[in-house]
Amino acid sequence: MAIREYLWVSLGGIVGACARYFLSRFTAKITGTSFPWGTLLINITGSFVLGLFLVYTTERVFVDPKWRLLIAIGFCGAYTTFSSYAYESMVYFQQGNWGLFAGNVLANNILCLAAVLGAGALVRSI
């Protein structure tokens, strides 16, 4: 990759990481920290944005590849939180908190998949 491509990914990553941090903190203030609602919200919205962007740009319009670097790889890559989701799930598992473990795993997998599918359906219906 050329240096310019790394810059597009980095720029998207900066914005995505900051958005993730802000939304995670904001959600924790509203919902508390007994369940990782911020991680779930971020994963769902990130999945939706990625699905919307990729379906739109592969099925509807051509975009310059730099936009995929910026949005799909940079922004969504830094914004979504699979590693946080995996860690939080492991903690619940190790604590024997089976309800929160199952709820976290199922909610992230089902709702994120639904967000991507919904975004694709939305783009195709427009």
UniProtKB/Swiss-Prot annotation:
Na(+) is not transported, but it plays an essential structural role and its presence is essential for fluoride channel function. GO terms for cellular component: plasma membrane. The keyword ATP-binding does not apply. Keywords: Cell inner membrane, Cell membrane, Ion channel, Ion transport, Membrane, Metal-binding, Sodium, Transmembrane, Transmembrane helix, Transport. The chain crosses the membrane at residues 7-24, 35-55, 69-89, 98-118. It is found in: Cell inner membrane. GO terms for biological process: cellular detoxification of fluoride. It is a multi-pass membrane protein. The keyword Cytoplasm does not apply. Na(+) binds at residues 77, 80. It comes from the Bacteria. InterPro entries: FluC. It holds the Pfam family CRCB. Its main location: membrane. It catalyses: fluoride(in) = fluoride(out). GO terms for molecular function: fluoride channel activity; metal ion binding. Fluoride-specific ion channel. Important for reducing fluoride concentration in the cell, thus reducing its toxicity. Belongs to the fluoride channel Fluc/FEX (TC 1.A.43) family. This is Fluoride-specific ion channel FluC. It comes from Koribacter versatilis (strain Ellin345). The lineage of its organism: Bacteria, Pseudomonadati, Acidobacteriota, Terriglobia, Terriglobales.
